[in-house]
Each structure stands twice: as structure tokens, then as C-alpha cells.
């Protein structure tokens, strides 16, 4: 019992020290020049490329442990770092460096009748806590985006990716030092004990300004329930694709297969296909065949089973499941209204797509579906900050306060008002 208490006290002290160092680093970081931040990002990119072999070796340790534990193939895919992915990670850092610096950007400006000139300008949030699970690339993405937006960051990765994250973090710190920025601007929690997460959720004595969770439903639910600081919630990506009767069939087949099968383990992967009842005879069977030929397992509604009897029957839980695997639920709905009703009932409000040529259908879908990202005639796998031109994202926020959709450098800022006068006093 005493050992447990001592361990908890030790983690609390460690985390408070990390918070204090982050707070101290946030002040010079907030006023760092764009050139200095960009120099750090470029140095980080070079460090990752030159340290590729060390990162792969560290990742191999994590992969071996995951395979020994019998973790799912989709989990291992998210965990895997190879030369191609590491090169893409380094490229992502350079792309963030090329983004416009959001800090001190004038968002709006106006003059009052009394001559006061008012500006609303972007400012860093301060210290951001990022809690994530199996994706080691989040270490680089989150570190880069927080740095670019002038924020210090505390990163707490999952125990499954601890070795990979440490190797990447060492490259980030090398970049900070090379550019003359505080090495505590990007900190990685050095312990895997879950008590560290609990400590972060308290705000570490007011040092953390916002928490960003990246992971499964249980992690996000815990963060939302226990956090004493604001949260940018990144819920599961229970994404839907609706194929309207007006859809071009070849386009629909291409988009549906890509949305599901390009990478099944990411949050932008489609988990449910909805087909217009008016398209049963023309679209349903070709879509099912295309998915089956691509190696996708189908969980089918009763109506779909009548068309393709050999499929596995869907149960209610399937419509609520983010598979993150080569599995998709398929249902027939009564037109655009039925699709909207189904999405409203089961969606996580992440990303939905409509495939249609009828402008009225598209307009209704865009107006009535309440999700962060809506796509027309495009794959749900475009739900990504990099694809939006944001240079990557720290997550996809599914809430409605402050940030929604891809959380990039602009979403990691707040604002303040600068008011210029010439001696005005209030009557």
C-alpha cells in the first residue's frame, strides 16, 4: 500500500514539474518569430530523416510486443512505421513550416464612431495536452502544429507506441535546440502509468489550457468525464456513405471501395454504406460485388440480404460500430430522408459523404446532416487536415465549441482585441 502511494506521489510530482516547464516555455514560444519556429521545424524534419534507422528499430520493439499480445491487424497498421511513413512524417513537418504563421494575424479590424480602432488578432492558447494511443506519428504531428501556433505541448502517447514515440520525440527536441527554442516546448511524458493521464486531466495546477484526446471511445469518454480543463473531443470516426439513386454507378463504386478499403484503420474510413431504395435494382448489387471483390466483409440489413443472401446479417450494434477493419455495414434507406434519419441516429458526427448528381439531394444532405465534415462525390478518406491544406491536424474535433473538423494551426489559437485610441475617455 505504501509503495502504491509513493508511486502515485512520484508521478504527481513528475507531472507537476512537466507542467511548470511547459508553462515556462510557453512565454518565449508565444513571441518567437515565424522564422525561428520554421527553422526548428526544418531541423526536426532533417533529424527524423537522419534518424530513420533508429526510429524503425524502436518501432520494431513496439510491433513485436503488439504481435505477441495478439493485437488486431488494424491496430498494428496504425502502429507501424516504415521508411515510406517516416519520410511522409518528415515531409509533414516541412509542410507545417511552409504554412502561414497564425500568431498575431489580424482576423478582423474596424473603427468605431468615436475613433477607436479595434483589431481582433490570433494568439496562442498556451499549453496544450495531447493524449493519444497507438499512432506514433501523432508525436510529430502534434508537436509540429503546436509549435507553429506558438503553443507548448505535453504529449502522452500510448504504452503500445512508447519506444516509437520516444525516438520521434528526440528528433523534435533536437530541432528545438538547433533553433534556439526552449527544449521543454515539446515534452513527452516519460512514464506509461495511467496515473499520468489522470494528472494531466486535472490541468497540472493550471498549467494546461486545453486537452486534445486522440484514441478510442473509452479514452475520449474518460477525458470528457474527468477533465477540469477544456477538451477538443476527437470521437470515433463512424463515417457513412450515402449512394443516391441519381449517383453515377462507376463513380459510386470507386468512391465506396476507396472510402472503406484504402486504409481501414483510420478514422476517415467508411463504416456504413446507405443505398437509396430507388437504386436497389441498378446500384446495390454492383456496389456489394465491388466491396466483396476488394476483400471487404459485409454486414447486411434484411433488405440487402434479399438481394445478396450469402452475406452476414447485421445486428443493431453493427450500425454503432467503428470497425477499423475490412468490414462495412450496408443498409437500404428510403431516399435522402431515410439516409439523414439513419445518420442522425447512429453517427458520431465526424464525417459523412453523399454520392449524387441531383443538386437538391446534395443541398439537403449538406443542410440537414450535423457532422463536422460533409463530402459530395468524394471519399471519406479525405477527412484529414493535410488533405484540407492545413499541413496535418492534431485531431478531428467532433464537438461544436471553438474547433470543429480538422484541428490545424489556426484552430490551436485563440484571439485577443487590440484597441488603439487617441486619448478617448468614456462619457
Swiss-Prot record:
One of its GO terms (molecular function) is NADP binding. GO terms for cellular component: cytoplasm. CDD domains: ALDH_F18-19_ProA-GPR (cd07079). It catalyses: L-glutamate 5-semialdehyde + phosphate + NADP(+) = L-glutamyl 5-phosphate + NADPH + H(+). It is an enzyme of class 1 (oxidoreductase). Keywords: Amino-acid biosynthesis, Cytoplasm, NADP, Oxidoreductase, Proline biosynthesis. InterPro entries: Ald_DH/histidinol_DH (IPR016161), Ald_DH_C (IPR016163), Ald_DH_N (IPR016162), Aldehyde_DH_dom (IPR015590), G-glutamylP_reductase_CS (IPR020593), Glu-5-SA_DH (IPR012134), GPR_dom (IPR000965). Pfam families: Aldedh. SUPFAM superfamilies: ALDH-like. Pathway: Amino-acid biosynthesis; L-proline biosynthesis; L-glutamate 5-semialdehyde from L-glutamate: step 2/2. Belongs to the gamma-glutamyl phosphate reductase family. PANTHER family: DELTA-1-PYRROLINE-5-CARBOXYLATE SYNTHASE, GLUTAMATE SEMIALDEHYDE DEHYDROGENASE. This is Gamma-glutamyl phosphate reductase. The gene is proA.
